[in-house]
Amino acid sequence: MPTIQQLIRNEREQARQKTKSPALKQCPQRRGVCTRVYTTTPKKPNSALRKVARVRLTSGFEVTAYIPGIGHNLQEHSVVMIRGGRVKDLPGVRYHIIRGTLDTAGVKDRKQGRSKYGTKRPKEAKK
C-alpha cells in the first residue's frame, strides 16, 4: 500500500485497454489484397466449411478475414475492404470482409438485410 506522499510523487498508472482489432490501427476499415482464399472448419460443436481469406493490409499486417453471405467472387489478388468483428467459432478470425465494395460483389438474390451484404434493392416485378 503506497503512502500519500508516494502517490503524490508518482501517480497510479491507468490500465491500458487492449484493442480487439489491432490491424485496423484505429481506423473503421482497411483496404487489403487477398493472398489466399480458402475454407476452414469451425470449433466443436459446430460443423461447416466457412469461407475465409488471408488478406495483406495497407497497414502492413496480414490477417485472416471472414467472407460473409452465400457465395462469393473472391480469388487471390482481389482487393477487399475489411472491418473489425470476430467469428466466434473460428479461432484467429477477427475481421470481416465488407461485401459490395472494391472487388467484392454483393450477395445475389438477397431480399432481407441487404445493406449488410452489399446488395442493391431489387427491381419490382412487372404485372
Curated annotation (Swiss-Prot):
Gene Ontology CC annotations of this record: small ribosomal subunit
Secretion signal, residue range per the UniProt entry: none
Positions of the UniProt region annotated as Disordered: 102-127
Modified residue annotations for 3-methylthioaspartic acid: 89
MF terms in GO: rRNA binding; structural constituent of ribosome; tRNA binding
Pfam families given in the database record: Ribosom_S12_S23
PROSITE patterns: RIBOSOMAL_S12 (PS00055)
Organism superkingdom: Bacteria
Ranges annotated as biased composition (Basic residues): 113-127
GO process terms (BP): translation
Keywords on record: Methylation, Ribonucleoprotein, Ribosomal protein, RNA-binding, rRNA-binding, tRNA-binding
Keyword flag Acetylation: no
Function, in words: With S4 and S5 plays an important role in translational accuracy.
HAMAP family: Ribosomal_uS12_B
Subunit structure: Part of the 30S ribosomal subunit. Contacts proteins S8 and S17. May interact with IF1 in the 30S initiation complex.
Protein family membership: Belongs to the universal ribosomal protein uS12 family.
Listed name of the protein: Small ribosomal subunit protein uS12
Species whose genome carries this gene: Nostoc punctiforme (strain ATCC 29133 / PCC 73102)
